[in-house]
Amino acid sequence: QLPSIFSHYTTPKGGFILHQYLFFIGSFPVRAYGLLFMLGIISSGLTAYYIMKRDGRGWHVHIFDFTMYCGLAGIVGGRLWDVFFFDWAYYQHHLTEIPYVWQGGMAIQGGLLFGAIAGILYTKHYHIDTWAFGDLLAPAIILGQSIGRMANLMNGDAFGHPTGGNFGIVYPETTLAYQTYSSQPLWPAEVWEGQIDVLVFVVLLFYSSFPHKKGQVFSLYVMLYAIERFFLEFLRGDYVNLTMGLKSAQMTSVIAFVIAFVVFLYLQFKGTTDTEDKAQA
């Protein structure tokens, strides 16, 4: 019998527990993490395709290749970021496990950085306006991130620290969350991040419907996600390494916000509106 995605468990309030494995093909496990992670990439690509087709500049024909290249770069970047910035204490003794991305352990910030680099190189190669392309892409990216956080939930990583009460998420014994905090209820940090990502998605679509300078939608996306991630890190319990009193993800968020804010203001005064460029095209 194949395991269901959810099964009941007993707590003071009742609830459900999450399965890392959806089913097995022979001895090969099909992980909920990998399935949802790929679903996030596919959903992001389809959303970008729809937005760009409506835009009318023909950029939608690039989405398949663009998603493939940026998705692969994002996987590499997300894995390396997690290994070297979050879990090096473990991986320095288990080097052969670094390529095992299907087991979980991906840092969104590293994935976004490597994906952005790949995206810039792609747009430059095909002579596509990078800022305008990024503005159209931003809502699709944050939507994919939201689904990615559900992958973290199913895998029991990117978890919160104990709530101190009888409310929260209790993870299965096979997860890192359980190995770290046992059966203590934990803050649903990854769930809330996924939900806030959806709100950011709506905000970006709303903002992009009004006249704006090229690059401002993407800059706004970076600022909003940086704010979101900075504060949610106070609830995260999967790592505690601090630099100047802040976690590494918070330091990265501060840097990303400052850069995006400066770029946003610069574009406001020195940039050109996307509608002007479309009219000239």
Segments from the language model and where they lie:
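A feature for loop-to-transmembrane-helix boundaries and adjacent hydrophobic helices
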Residues: 3-281
